[in-house]
């Protein structure tokens, strides 16, 4: 039977033959092949030490990449103060996280559902960076319920504006978004103009803590989970 991939053969010593067979398997952990005599027969006993990659190695790498991304985002006020160099750096860090996405079909996963807090975006419409800081939303949320195919975006202080819309899955990663109703100051409903409030969103990374999405025009959205139980009012 063939030796496992993780097994490195050490040195086979045969007293009867009087010579050694060096091994060159290239793996990291040696195996001692000991020859012992019992009665008139010579038996070969293999004492193997196995070495496997750390079971959580992928998770640790993912955790580190996420930490680097979030750490780089923290001083940028969700992207409002990001320079072109900052934007390039965040995009590069985001792509590293996307490359280790543990959820291959995000739209089929329950991880996508709930209330997410926006921590970074390149969307000028959301950032409103040209406005005085006191007129910008303090916090932005995006909510998704795939079972009802609903999406909601909410702002907090000072205006509490929100918008709800419908989702149409295009594949296991991308949805078409059609905004339906805006609420001004949190309670004044305004119907979205026909044909203008449409877009597409690709979910490029999602786990229990973090979600990364991309839209047309090089739009980037990075969000952290706020409330996985949140339901969008119907």
Swiss-Prot record:
Keywords: Chloroplast, Plastid, Thylakoid, Transit peptide. Residues 1-45 form a transit peptide. It is found in: Plastid, Chloroplast thylakoid. InterPro entries: PAP, PAP/fibrillin_dom. The keyword Amino-acid biosynthesis does not apply. The keyword Ubl conjugation does not apply. GO terms for cellular component: chloroplast; chloroplast thylakoid membrane. Pfam families: PAP_fibrillin. PANTHER family: PLASTID-LIPID-ASSOCIATED PROTEIN 4, CHLOROPLASTIC-RELATED (PTHR31906). Belongs to the PAP/fibrillin family. This is Probable plastid-lipid-associated protein 5, chloroplastic. The gene is PAP5.
């Amino acid at each position: 039977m063939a030796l496992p991939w993780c097994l490195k053969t050490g040195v086979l010593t045969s007293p009867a033959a009087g010579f050694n067979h060096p091994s060159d398997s290239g793996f990291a952990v040696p195996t001692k092949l000991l020859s012992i005599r019992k009665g008139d027969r010579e038996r070969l006993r293999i004492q193997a030490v196995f070495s496997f990659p750390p079971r959580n190695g992928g998770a640790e790498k993912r955790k580190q990449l996420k930490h680097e991304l979030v750490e780089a985002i923290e001083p940028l006020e969700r992207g409002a103060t990001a320079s072109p160099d900052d934007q390039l750096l965040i995009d590069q860090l985001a792509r590293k996280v996307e490359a280790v996405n543990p959820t291959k079909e995000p739209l089929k996963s329950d991880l996508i559902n709930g209330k997410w807090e926006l921590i970074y975006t390149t969307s000028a419409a959301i950032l409103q960076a040209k406005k005085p800081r006191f007129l910008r939303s303090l916090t932005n949320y995006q909510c998704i319920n795939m079972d009802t195919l609903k999406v909601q975006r909410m702002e907090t202080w000072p205006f509490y504006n929100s918008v709800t819309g419908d989702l149409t899955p295009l594949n296991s990663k991308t949805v078409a978004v059609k905004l339906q109703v805006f609420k001004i100051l949190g309670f004044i409903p305004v119907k979205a103009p026909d044909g203008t409030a449409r877009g597409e969103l690709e979910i490029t990374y999602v786990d229990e803590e973090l979600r990364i999405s991309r839209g047309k025009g090089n739009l980037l959205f990075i969000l952290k989970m706020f409330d996985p139980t949140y339901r969008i009012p119907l």
